[in-house]
């Protein structure tokens, strides 16, 4: 599954982002996050473990403090995780995508952050650290960049607002 997900991510990220009509870059998503805090729509009961108990204001302050200076724009799914990818069980080939409401041009780390978080879950019998490592190996075959741990952390934080 990790190899199929990596191939999907690589294919999406290889599309011409300049032709994508949907903007999910930080000039759009950070103000949306601030609006979510102001409206009280951030689900503070469903935060990642390292942020349990945080207020919306604290989340937003951390988001602003850690905002990356640059973006490696690509066409992104926006919520790339195994639950949103349909696979043929016989061939393990991707047959479709669901939950595509956040598709748009964004930093590729926004997809990488979410899929790697999901694949690394040790308590899930289907996944674990070896799955995220396999994903990175396969994804890296078609990309000359480097994964930024700081950006991964930032985009996981940004996901808390949506």
Model-derived segments and spans:
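Alpha-helical scaffolds flanking conserved acidic
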Residues: 148-155
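Short runs of predominantly hydrophobic/aromatic residues within well-ordered alpha helices
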Residues: 2-5, 109-112, 154
């Amino acid at each position: 599954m990790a190899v199929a997900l990596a191939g999907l991510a690589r294919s999406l990220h290889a599309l011409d982002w300049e032709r994508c009509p949907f903007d999910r870059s930080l000039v759009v998503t950070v103000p949306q996050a601030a609006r979510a805090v102001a409206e009280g729509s951030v689900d503070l009961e469903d935060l990642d473990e390292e942020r349990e108990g945080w207020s919306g204001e604290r989340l937003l302050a951390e988001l602003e403090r850690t905002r990356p200076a640059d973006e490696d724009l690509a066409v992104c799914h926006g919520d790339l995780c195994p639950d949103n990818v349909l696979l043929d069980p016989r061939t393990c080939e991707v047959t479709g995508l669901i939950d595509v409401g956040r598709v748009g041009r964004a930093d590729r780390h926004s997809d990488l952050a979410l899929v790697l978080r999901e694949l690394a879950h040790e308590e899930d019998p289907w996944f674990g650290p070896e799955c995220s490592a396999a994903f990175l190996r396969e994804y890296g075959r078609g990309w000359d960049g480097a994964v930024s741990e700081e950006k991964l952390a930032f985009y996981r934080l940004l996901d808390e607002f949506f």
